Amino acid sequence: MNKVLDPQGVRPEGLNDRENWEGPASDGHVFRAGELDLSHKVILYLDDISVSFDGFKALNKLNLAIDAGELRCIIGPNGAGKTTMMDVITGKTRPDEGKCFFGQTIDLTRMTEPEIAHAGIGRKFQKPTIFEHHTAFENLELAMKMDKRVWKSLFAALSDDEYDRVSDVLRQIRLDHEAERPAGLLSHGQKQWLEIGMLLMQEPRLLLLDEPVAGMTDDETERTAELFVSLAGKHSLVVVEHDMSFVEALGGMVTVLHEGSVLAEGDLATVQNDQRVIEVYLGR
C-alpha cells in the first residue's frame, strides 16, 4: 500500500505515532456484527479516495485518518469536498478510486448505507430530523437499538435498563428537564441536541456531524462544544464546521480540505497561520 500521503505531501496527523503501520489489511471485508478491529487505534481511514461528478473532481486522492476516540474538525471553503467525503463514509456515494476503512479491516466501500449505520457510524445533517409530535423521551425511545419494529416499540413497555438508558442520554444532552415536552416545541438548539441523542441511542462508535451549531444562539453553541468534548473518548467525532469560534472551543485537531484533498492539518492556530490556508480559505 502507498504511504499515507495526500497529493500535497501532508501526512494525516492521526498516523504520526504509528510509524510501523502501513494502513488497513488489504483483504478488507464486509462487516459482521460485533467486529471492529482497533488494534492500531485508527477508527476511520480514507486511502486515496477520488470522486468525480460530470468531470468535476469532488475528491482528489483524499487521505485521512481518525483515531479511536478522537474529536476532529474538518474545515474548508465551499466545494472543498467536505460533504462528498461524508457521503463516501456513509455509503451514499461510491468512490471512483480508493478505499475507506472502518477500523483495520471493514471496507465501507463494499457496504450499503444501512449496513454502515448498523456497523456503528451515525451521521447528523445540518437540519434536525426528529418526531415533532412526540416528546423528547419518546424520540429517544424510538431511536433505541431494539429488535422491534417502530410501531411496536411505541407501545411496548420499557425494561428498567432501557428506561435508565433513555434517561441517561437525556441528561447527557441536557434535555432531562424537557423529557415530556413535545419535540416540536423545543428550541432550535435543543432539537439539534435531541437528534444527537437519537444517534447516541444507536450506540455509534463514530459520529459524523455536519455544521451542528448553524442557527444556534451563543449559549447553545457553547453548550454544544461542551457536549462534544464530553462525548470524545467513548465515541469518535468528525465535525464539519464553518464557525471558527466553535472549532476553537472544541480544541481538537483540524483538517483543512481544498479541492478534494488535505491542504493542512494541526491545531486551529497552526492551520490559521499556514500561508496556503490563508490564501485559499481565510481570504487574507
Per-region residue spans from a language model:
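ABC-family P-loop ATPase nucleotide-binding domain
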Residues: 1-50
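Conserved ABC ATPase "signature" region
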Residues: 34, 153-178, 226
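The feature captures the beta-strand-to-loop junction immediately N-terminal to the Walker
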Residues: 75-77
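Helix-to-loop junction immediately C-terminal to a conserved catalytic motif
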Residues: 90
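ABC ATPase NBD Q-loop/coupling interface
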Residues: 99-118
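Conserved ABC nucleotide-binding domain
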Residues: 109-110, 169-190
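Catalytic Walker B motif of ABC-type/P-loop ATPase nucleotide-binding domains
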Residues: 207-211
